Amino acid sequence: MVSKVALLLAVLVCSQYMAQGVYVVSKAEWGGRGAKWTVGLGNYLSYAIIHHTAGSYCETRAQCNAVLQSVQNYHMDSLGWPDIGYNFLIGGDGNVYEGRGWNNMGAHAAEWNPYSIGISFLGNYNWDTLEPNMISAAQQLLNDAVNRGQLSSGYILYGHRQVSATECPGTHIWNEIRGWSHWSG
């Protein structure tokens, strides 16, 4: 009986973090800290903003967990933010990782935060290689965001450099996203 209950709970927890087509590794699964506080984020948002963390790249789940914890510690302890800044992050392993998630406003693009979700790739894409599994994960996540009503069907995709004075999301990501259907120059 206990094993059936444990299995049921595991299925429920996993389904909570399953987007329409892409599995999202929960903050608890990657060892993230709880937010100090949150601010709600609406539905049918107009923008998705793509970033890179400009730090360490990761290729395995264990490496990505460590990098995520480091990014979160920097955001919370050094910058004084209540949580990691992005809604979702994508590792070199092709996994999508929960940051602030679907319903909490991020801290990734100043005045754009209330109107957007922030998706960041772990690494520095001025020199790190953007792999096909990472591109696929990001595109699936964006499609899921539309299907679940988080992004409007006519959302606009920006690279961080379009809304702030920065090199983010790095040259390799920048060159990639300019070919995506929702990107706007």
Swiss-Prot record:
Constitutively expressed at high level in gut, in addition to the induced expression in fat body. The keyword Metal-binding applies. Its EC number is 3.5.1.28. The record marks 86 as: Essential for zinc hydrate coordination. SUPFAM superfamilies: N-acetylmuramoyl-L-alanine amidase-like. It holds the Pfam family Amidase_2. Residues 1-21 form the signal peptide. Its main location: secreted. Residues 46-170 form the N-acetylmuramoyl-L-alanine amidase domain. Induction: Up-regulated by PGN from B.subtilis. It comes from the Eukaryota. It is found in: Secreted. It catalyses: Hydrolyzes the link between N-acetylmuramoyl residues and L-amino acid residues in certain cell-wall glycopeptides. N-acetylmuramyl-L-alanine amidase involved in innate immunity by degrading bacterial peptidoglycans (PGN). Plays a scavenger role by digesting biologically active PGN into biologically inactive fragments. Has no direct bacteriolytic activity. This is Peptidoglycan-recognition protein SC1b. It comes from Drosophila melanogaster (Fruit fly).
